[in-house]
Amino acid sequence: MTSPTFELVIGEGCDTSVAEGVRSALGAHVPERAVHEVGQADIVVAVGGDGTIMRVARQVLDAGASSRILGVSGGRLGFLAAFEVEELPLYLGAIRAGTLSIENRHALHWRLLRDGQEAATGCAVNDVVLAAGQPFRAIELEGEVDGGAIPRFLGDGLIVATSAGSTAHAASAGGPIVAPGLEATILVPLAAHSLAWRPLVLPAEASVALNVHHANEGSSLVQDGRLAERLQAGDRVEVASHFQTLRFLRHPERPFGATLAAKLGWAAPPSWRRPGDDA
C-alpha cells in the first residue's frame, strides 16, 4: 500500500496506528502499535497475500479479540482479500460507517500431545496438515471424530481444513469447495493408500484426533502452510473449532462465485485455438 492510499484509509476522525516496522515503509506519521495489541482495534487492515491475511487473523485470535478484518490484496493471489488496493477509495465511506456486511468464519485450534503431555498448541485459519515429509515414506495415522474411530490412514498426509481453507491446499488435493456461511471441518487425504479413503465433510464443531503410528524424520504438523512442529511416532494431534469466530468484511458487489472464477479459474472452459489462429 502506498502512502497516499494509506492516508485515504486513515482519513479524518480515525484513531489509527500501524504495526511495528510498517510506519517507515509507508512514510506515515502515525503511532506504532505492538503486534500483541492488535485486538484493541475495531478494524484491522491486512494488506498482502493470503499468508499475510492469515497471519493477521491468527494474531486477532491470539489476542482474543472481536476485531473486524479488512483484507486488501497485495500479493499474488489474495483469495482471502475482499478488496483490491485501487478500489479502496470507492468503499472507504462504507468501511468507516460500519455498513459493510461481515462474513463470520470459524477457525481451528490444535494441540500436540507427546508422552501424554501437551507439547504445543496453535490456531489455523485455513488448515492443519499432518504431512509425511522426508524421506517421503507414508505416514500412518489412526483417527477419531468426536471420540468415534475412523479408518486408519496410510499415505502422504491428511488435511483438516475449515470452509475458508476448502479453496486452498484442500482444493488442490481434490477436496470439496465449501461456500461461505456453510461452516464445516473437512478431512482431505493426500495420496491415500486406499482408493476408498475419500474427503469427508464434518460439522464445524466436530473434534478430530489423530494418533501418529508411523512417522518419518521429516514428518510435520503444518499450520496454514507453515511448519509448526515436527511429528514422531506416538504423538497425538487434537483439532477442534476455535472458540472465537473471525469477522471478515465482505465486498458488497463481489459474490463468492465471481471470486472463485476470477482468482481460481473456477468452471473456466478449456483453452483452445482455431486452425490458423496465431500461436
Model feature map: region roles:
Residues 130, 146-149, 198-279:
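ATP/nucleoside-binding phosphotransfer catalytic cores, i.e., glycine-rich phosphate-binding loops
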Residues 1-47, 54-62, 85-103, 112-122:
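ATP/NTP phosphate-donor binding region
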Residues 64-68:
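A short helix->loop->beta-strand "cap" motif at the edges of active sites that frequently abuts
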Residues 77-156:
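Catalytic core of DAGKc-family lipid kinases
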Residues 51-57, 167-172:
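Short glycine/serine/threonine-rich phosphate/pyrophosphate-binding segments
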